[in-house]
C-alpha cells in the first residue's frame, strides 16, 4: 500500500488516509503495445510469452486469412455522404485493428473492392465477420500484452 499521510479534516488530527501513488507506465510497455497492434502476436513474442503469442496471435492471423478466403470485405473511409459515410467508420476501426495485415491489403487493394459478384458469394458475410473479429481480437491481444509489460498482469 501507499504511504500513510496525516490529513487535517475539520480539525481532526487523528484521522489518517492511505493514498496510493501510481507509478507511471514504463515506456517499454507502450512500445510492446504498439508492436502488438502492428504485427499480431509480436507483443507477446517480445516478452517471451510463447504460448500466448501462438494462441492469440495465431487466432488473429487465422481469422484474417479465413475472412479473406471467404471473400469478406474490409471497410475503409468511403466517399459517400451523410450517414452512409459515418456508418463505415466503426467497422473500419474494427478492421484497422488487424494492424499490418489491414495495411498490406489496403496497399495491394485486396478485400476492398465493391464487387457485386463478391457480395453474392454465400460466404461473404461470414468473411466480413471473420475480418472484423480479427481486428477486434487483436485489440484485446494488444491490451493483454500491454498490461503484462506494464506489470499489471503476470
PLM feature spans:
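Hydrophobic, membrane-inserted alpha-helices
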Residues: 36-41
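Membrane-interface helix starts
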Residues: 45-55
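Transmembrane helix recognition focused on a "late"/terminal membrane span
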Residues: 2-33, 56-154
Amino acid at each position: 500500500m501507499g504511504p500513510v499521510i496525516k490529513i487535517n479534516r475539520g480539525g481532526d488530527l487523528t484521522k489518517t488516509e492511505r493514498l496510493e501513488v501510481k507509478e507511471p507506465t514504463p515506456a517499454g510497455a507502450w512500445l510492446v503495445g504498439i508492436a502488438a497492434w502492428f504485427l499480431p502476436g509480436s507483443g507477446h513474442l517480445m516478452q517471451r510469452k510463447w504460448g500466448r503469442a501462438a494462441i492469440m496471435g495465431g487466432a488473429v492471423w487465422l481469422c484474417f486469412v479465413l475472412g479473406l478466403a471467404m471473400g469478406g470485405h474490409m471497410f475503409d473511409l468511403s466517399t459517400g455522404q451523410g450517414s452512409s459515410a459515418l456508418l463505415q467508420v466503426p467497422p473500419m476501426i474494427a478492421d484497422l485493428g488487424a494492424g499490418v495485415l489491414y495495411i498490406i491489403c489496403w496497399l495491394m487493394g485486396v478485400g476492398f473492392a465493391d464487387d457485386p459478384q463478391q457480395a453474392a458469394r454465400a460466404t461473404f458475410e461470414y468473411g466480413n465477420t471473420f475480418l472484423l473479429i480479427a481486428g477486434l481480437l487483436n485489440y484485446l491481444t494488444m491490451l493483454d500484452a500491454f498490461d503484462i509489460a506494464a506489470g499489471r498482469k503476470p
